[in-house]
Structure formats: C-alpha cells, structure tokens
Amino acid sequence: MTSTSGQTTVADDTTTADAAYARLRRGTTLLWQGDFHNGRQLIRAVDRRLTKQAARKGTKKQSAGTAADLFLRQREDRARRAEILGRIVVDLAERDGQWLLDLHRAPDVAGACGHAYGAPSRGESRRTPFTALQGVLGAYQWHLNGVEVPALGEKVYPDYGVFSPTRSEYVDLVDDLSLIHI
C-alpha cells in the first residue's frame, strides 16, 4: 500500500505523535513496526491533533452556512480523519496457515483475521490500516460474545462487515414498525 504521495516510511516507538502527524498530513503512509499498544496510543494522539485542527477550522466556519452545510463539513472532516488515520498501517503475515501480527505485545489475531479475511494462503501477507485491524478485533469479540439487543430480548452474533445493532434505537424503530398496519 502506498499513500497518495507514494511514500511509505517505517514508524516505531521512537516516532513522536507530532512527527507522525506531520508525515501523515503530507500524504506519507506509516508502516507501524513498534509495540502494538504504543501504536494504539499513537493513533489516539494523532486523532487528538486532527480533532483540534477540525475544531479550529470549524470555529472559523461555524456561523457560515446552513445546517446542511455544517453536516457536509462534518462528513468531510470525518472522511479526512479516516483517510489520515488509515495511513498508519501494519503488516499481517501467514504462519502455520493462520494470520500473524508480528509486533511486540500484539494480541493473537489469527481467529479474528481468519474470520474477517479468510484463511491466508501459504506465504501470503497483507498490509492493512491499523484502525481497520482494530475494527476486525472488536467485531470478532462481538461475534464471539454477542451483542445484547433489548428489543429482541436476546443476543445477536454479528460477523465482521455486518451492521451491528449497538444502537438500540434503530432496533426499537424497526420493532415499532410492526405496530404499523400498512
């Protein structure tokens, strides 16, 4: 994976959040090779900088425009945030027929990545955004443990990539539709 600028550089535990933020804003992709938990902290630190930047930008434009304009600007800011954070990537590799994340203190990703991506081919590797990997790991926990849906009175076990009913008002709304006679 390369960024729009075509550059990918290695980042590790010595990479500061300010340095990472500057590189990411220039379009560079950062291949994380440090400690797993430090990588998560780096993502949060870069996200805080993006939030501050959006707040400063938003304050200038806050009064200008309609509610629709504000909504569109918020969507643009979120898309930009996702695009920038998505350029912090990690390499997954196949080992013994399972996915492996070879970072210090990394969780076992074999089950989660196998569930989301399928079993790897021999020698296969995959470069994925760190944030996407976090989503895969979280979704796998939802799949294993289930998500309580009060409107149903039971748990559902969503797969990765499937809408998870974590916002009960959506399920309640669908449940209320059964009361309407069309």
Specify the residue positions occupied by each region the protein language model found:
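N-terminal auxiliary segments of SAM/dcSAM-dependent transferases
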Residues: 9, 28-147
